[in-house]
């Protein structure tokens, strides 16, 4: 599918992930279209393809072939989408079809006959990528006629669109890469500065408002805040430890998946090797049988030769017997001729020549017998050696088969153990997620309850503040109506009687009765230093009492009450959140709160 000399996809291959409307011929002026006629010349296209190390024959531009058009589309898919033949036709490359569903456990789900569909799967994926590529380039909708009956104009238009897109991608990358990086860094820094400025302003306003009125309380809150921040840092460190442990478990999970895949591949390799060994084991006995038959034929041939030699020896023996008879006859003849030889020839010449001839014949017969016996021994030794080799091969075959069966059983046990461990890890992860969701729900409920409590307290503050204003006004009126010669005890009794008379039956009577002690203390503070100077100090004591009342009134204003309640609410909410986290962590990890022998907590690590 892929054309030769394809370049590696760049970092901007992700541009192909944008919708097709962004690169349509009606919305973008950078791509060629039929209504604008914006196309590149053939020479420019060839130069661009040469720059990308793609060689196209000249016949493709005049009479394109389906294979050439497919190669051009493959080059465009790899350059724009960053997908190679290993990504598009992975089934044909690996030779098997695998499922991406976790329920099938990433194993083969097609039989040997079903593997014929691997090519069809790759073709369907390739056609969908071609359709997506046409939409990205702003070309007409892709159809199978593009490959079945390609035209020169269509091929040139497609090549022009691809070159224009590659040029546009390179120019945009060179033009805006530094600006985009600079803008992203500036946005991050600006966001951080704005957040820091808001935090500083809020802290400054809060401290200015509380500094004059609540200096001791501010010190205590500051100390408590430092303690809470320290505890928060500890909680953050514990959370970081938990996150690291979660990441480690995820990494272990990923490694287990990879090892499981490796084991599956190793199991497949072992199966294939077992089949090959099984084929060898099946065929080798036939070869041994053939070899044994050949050896039997050879043994029969040697037996026949041995029989022939035995027959020859028997014939030689017969010849020897005949020769002995002949010798006897010759002796008789010699006896007959001896007289003649004695008379004619020397008697010893004939006898000496005869003995030499017989000795030579006896030596030749002995040598032949030794050679035959040696050949018989060699054949027997070769037969025994072949029998031993056959036994060794059978024993090795049995040992190898036993070893392979043991390896296969161990591999199966390891796969089952890893599957069980993976299931346990998944269950633990799901339990952690469920506990985190429960914690979030409880925190939301706690915030809602705190909000309702704050609203109710604010309403009560408004009521108390209104009652206090009414009461202070009545007190000032009564003070103005009191006789000047009364002492403090008489003034207090007169105030109580006058209040009971004037406000009997009022809805706020109960609340005012509860604050009689507070009014008495106000009267005591606002009274003059001596009874003798009562009249002279009366104009001064009344403004002083009024100022005291106003100051106490300011101390109990709704704004300061709200501030106190907000501070108390924040403290209460933070303490409740800390206690809730501690209870949840103790419930989830009971063993983590128990210190080890070295004084360390095993779940959260060393305390800071």
Swiss-Prot record:
It comes from the Eukaryota. Residues 121-125 are annotated as: Required for nuclear localization and function. One of its GO terms (biological process) is cell division. One of its GO terms (cellular component) is Ndc80 complex. Residues 176-319, 358-460 form a coiled coil. Its main location: nucleus. It is found in: Chromosome, Centromere, Kinetochore. Disruption phenotype: Conditional knockdown results in parasite inability to form plaques, indicating an essential role for parasite survival. Dissociation of centrosomes from the nucleus. Increase in centrosome inner and outer core dissociation. Disappearance of NDC80 from the kinetochore. Nuclei segregation defects. Chromosome segregation defects. No significant effects on centromere clustering. No significant effects on apicoplast segregation. Keywords: Cell cycle, Cell division, Centromere, Chromosome, Coiled coil, Kinetochore, Mitosis. Belongs to the NUF2 family. Required for anchoring centrosomal cores to the nuclear periphery. Plays a role in chromosome segregation but is dispensable for centromere clustering. This is Kinetochore protein NUF2. It comes from Toxoplasma gondii (strain ATCC 50611 / Me49). The gene is NUF2.
């Amino acid at each position: 599918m892929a054309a030769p000399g394809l370049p590696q996809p760049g970092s901007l291959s992700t541009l192909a992930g944008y919708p097709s409307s962004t690169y349509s011929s009606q919305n973008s002026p950078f791509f060629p279209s039929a209504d604008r006629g914006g196309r590149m010349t053939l020479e420019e296209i060839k130069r661009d393809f040469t720059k990308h190390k793609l060689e196209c024959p000249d016949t493709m531009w005049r009479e394109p072939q389906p294979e050439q058009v497919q190669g051009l589309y493959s080059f465009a898919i790899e350059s724009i989408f960053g997908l190679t033949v290993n990504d598009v036709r992975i089934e044909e490359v690996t030779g098997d079809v695998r499922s991406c569903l976790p329920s099938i456990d990433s194993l083969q789900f097609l039989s040997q006959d079903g593997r014929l569909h691997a090519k069809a799967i790759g073709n369907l994926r390739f056609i969908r990528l071609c359709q997506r590529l046409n939409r990205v380039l702003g070309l007409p909708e892709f159809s199978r006629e593009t490959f079945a009956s390609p035209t020169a104009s269509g091929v040139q238009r497609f090549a022009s669109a691809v070159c224009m897109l590659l040029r546009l991608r390179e120019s945009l990358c060179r033009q805006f890469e530094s600006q985009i990086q600079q803008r992203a860094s500036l946005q991050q820094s600006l966001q951080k500065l704005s957040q820091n400025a808001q935090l500083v302003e809020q802290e400054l306003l809060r401290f200015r408002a509380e500094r004059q009125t609540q200096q001791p309380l501010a010190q205590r809150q500051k100390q408590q805040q430092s303690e809470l921040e320290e505890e928060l840092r500890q909680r953050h460190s514990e959370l970081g430890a938990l996150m690291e442990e979660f990441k480690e478990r995820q990494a272990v999970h990923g490694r287990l998946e990879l090892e499981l895949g490796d084991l599956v591949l190793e199991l497949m390799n072992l199966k294939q090797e077992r089949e090959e060994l099984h084929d060898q084991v099946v065929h080798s006995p036939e070869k041994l049988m053939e070899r044994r038959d050949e050896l039997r034929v050879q043994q029969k041939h040697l037996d026949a030769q041995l029989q022939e030699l035995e027959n020859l020896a028997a014939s030689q023996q017969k010849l020897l017997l005949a020769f002995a008879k002949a010798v006897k006859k010759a002796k008789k003849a010699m006896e007959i001729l001896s007289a003649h030889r004695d008379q004619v020839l020397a008697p010893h010449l004939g006898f000496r020549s005869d003995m030499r001839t017989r000795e030579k014949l006896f030596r030749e017969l002995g040598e032949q017998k030794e050679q035959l016996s040696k050949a018989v021994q060699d054949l027997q030794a070769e037969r025994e050696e072949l029998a031993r080799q056959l036994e060794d091969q059978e024993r090795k075959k049995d040992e190898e088969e036993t070893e392979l069966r043991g390896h296969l059983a161990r591999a199966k046990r390891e796969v089952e153990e890893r599957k069980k461990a993976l299931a346990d890890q998944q269950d633990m992860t799901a339990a952690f997620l469920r506990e985190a969701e429960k914690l979030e729900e409880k925190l939301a409920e706690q915030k809602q309850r705190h909000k309702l409590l704050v609203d109710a307290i604010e309403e009560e503050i408004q009521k108390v503040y209104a009652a206090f204003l009414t009461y202070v006004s009545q007190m000032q009126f009564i003070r103005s109506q009191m006789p000047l010669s009364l002492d403090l005890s008489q003034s207090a009794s007169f105030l109580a009687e006058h209040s009971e008379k004037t406000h009997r039956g009022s809805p706020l009577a109960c609340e005012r009765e509860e604050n009689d002690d507070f009014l008495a203390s106000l009267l005591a503070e606002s009274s003059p230093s001596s009874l003798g100077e009562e009249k002279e100090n009366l104009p001064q004591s009344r403004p002083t009492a009024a100022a005291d009342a106003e100051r106490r009134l300011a101390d109990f204003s709704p704004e300061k009450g709200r501030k106190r309640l907000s501070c108390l609410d924040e403290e209460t909410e933070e303490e409740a959140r800390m206690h809730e986290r501690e209870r949840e962590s103790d419930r989830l990890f009971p063993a983590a709160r128990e210190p080890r022998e070295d004084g360390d907590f095993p779940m959260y690590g060393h305390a800071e």
